[in-house]
Every structure is written in C-alpha cells, then in structure tokens.
Amino acid sequence: MWKEFKEFAMKGNVIDLAIGVIIGGAFGKIVTSLVNDIIMPVIGRLVGKVDFSNLYINLSGQQFNSLQEAQAAGAATINYGLFLNNLINFLIIAFSIFIVIKQINKLKNFTKKKEEVQVEATEKDCPYCCTKIDIKATRCPHCTSVLEEATNQSS
C-alpha cells in the first residue's frame, strides 16, 4: 500500500498540483494585501475617506461606533465592506488566472501550428464511385472509370 501511495504521489500531475496549490495560496495572500492595503485605501480616499473594511449594516438595533465593537458585542451585522474587499480580491485573481490561461493556450496553439506540417495529398476521391484512389491514378481500380482529370493532365 505504501508503494502504491508513493507511486501516486510521485506522479507528475500530483506534484504539479501541489506546487500549484502552494503558489496559488501565496498569490492569494499577495492579492489580498494588494486589495486591502493599496487598492481599497485609494478608492476609500477618492469616495470620501471611507474605510471599506468598517462598512456594515447593524441588524441588532443597538448603536456601535465600529464593526469591531458590533462583533465584540455579538451583534448581527451585514459586513458589505468586507464583502466588497473580497469581491475585488476575487476579480483580480480571476482576471490574473484568465490572462495566464489565455497565454498558455496561445503558446499551445503556436507550438501546435509549428508542428503541423503541410502534408501533400496522396489520395483523391473517384468522382464516379466516391472511393479513395491514388492521386496519380488515371482509372479507378474499384469502378474502372476513366478519370478525365488525369487524362487531361497527361496530354
């Protein structure tokens, strides 16, 4: 059983997946910091010195000065400011992944086009019986029809 697990874990796909998860986690932290520490303060400043992480709707009916106070008191709140931060965070990650996947697909198509070599046709269809025949044939071996194209070319 250990041997099977070792073979499974050492397959390229599993290791690639593990590396992707680790890099994705680190990338997520960077994007979260970008949103929380750089983008949202600038947007907050532009719309009137608002800290989006403190925007909430108090459902308890009591008065609180901040989201932290409401949460400490156990009040029910709708934290739409944190939701906006997470939404922007998601959009940045989704757009980044879209760009990476688009570039990977572009690279795959580029290499695929390079590999596609123009192969010269060696067969054609008989106009009478529609079977595949050699391109140089002057008579169809299946229906024995004389092929006009080949006779015209040889004259």
UniProtKB/Swiss-Prot annotation:
Function in brief: Channel that opens in response to stretch forces in the membrane lipid bilayer. May participate in the regulation of osmotic pressure changes within the cell.
GO molecular function terms listed in the Swiss-Prot or TrEMBL record: mechanosensitive monoatomic ion channel activity
NCBIfam families: mscL, PRK00567.1-4, PRK13952.1
Compartments (UniProt record): Cell membrane
Gene for this chain: mscL
Main location: membrane
Name of the protein this chain belongs to: Large-conductance mechanosensitive channel
Family: Belongs to the MscL family.
